[in-house]
Amino acid sequence: MEFILSLIGSLLLVICVLVSVAFLTLLERKVLGYIQIRKGPNKVGLMGIPQPFCDAIKLFTKEQTYPLLSNYLSYYISPIFSLFLSLFVWMCMPFFVKLYSFNLGGLFFLCCTSLGVYTVMVAGWSSNSNYALLGGLRAVAQTISYEVSLALIGFKILLFSLL
């Protein structure tokens, strides 16, 4: 019974995160509309609330294209894997009710965020384009260099909180 409740809780968490991302993009569009002195997305429906749902319908009904010489399976699996990794990060966050008991939640967070780098590299490699591969390798090198400083800052905060 506890497993079913934790599964329902994690599914509810994932749905809330995805819906909140949709409405944060709506907020971003509204702020950009006010900054640029133009009409924002608040003209659709009631205060623009249906806009994220219309965007989702538009994205799901678009024609899917892929490079002709690409590795088709890894070209489409790598963004999906990246999405799942970013959703797994939310499972280790402490909430009022613990979904899963993590003794090493910080290490799980660092592992999931560092694995997200390699999906960019696989997407660049699987397109069979030299430019996409170089861009993926550049993104990997840049992200790894930022992760080292992030981990050192996190360990410094952890060390000073223990003293």
Curated annotation (Swiss-Prot):
One of its GO terms (cellular component) is mitochondrial inner membrane. It catalyses: a ubiquinone + NADH + 5 H(+)(in) = a ubiquinol + NAD(+) + 4 H(+)(out). One of its GO terms (biological process) is aerobic respiration. It is a multi-pass membrane protein. Its main location: mitochondrion. It comes from the Eukaryota. It is found in: Mitochondrion inner membrane. Its EC number is 7.1.1.2. Keywords: Electron transport, Membrane, Mitochondrion, Mitochondrion inner membrane, NAD, Respiratory chain, Translocase, Transmembrane, Transmembrane helix, Transport, Ubiquinone. InterPro entries: NADH_UbQ_OxRdtase_su1/FPO, NADH_UbQ_OxRdtase_su1_CS. GO terms for molecular function: NADH dehydrogenase (ubiquinone) activity. Coiled coil: none annotated. It is an enzyme of class 7 (translocase). The keyword Membrane applies. The chain crosses the membrane at residues 3-23, 77-97, 104-124, 143-163. PANTHER family: NADH DEHYDROGENASE SUBUNIT 1, NADH-UBIQUINONE OXIDOREDUCTASE CHAIN 1. Core subunit of the mitochondrial membrane respiratory chain NADH dehydrogenase (Complex I) that is believed to belong to the minimal assembly required for catalysis. Complex I functions in the transfer of electrons from NADH to the respiratory chain. The immediate electron acceptor for the enzyme is believed to be ubiquinone. Belongs to the complex I subunit 1 family. This is NADH-ubiquinone oxidoreductase chain 1. It comes from Drosophila subsilvestris. The gene is mt:ND1.
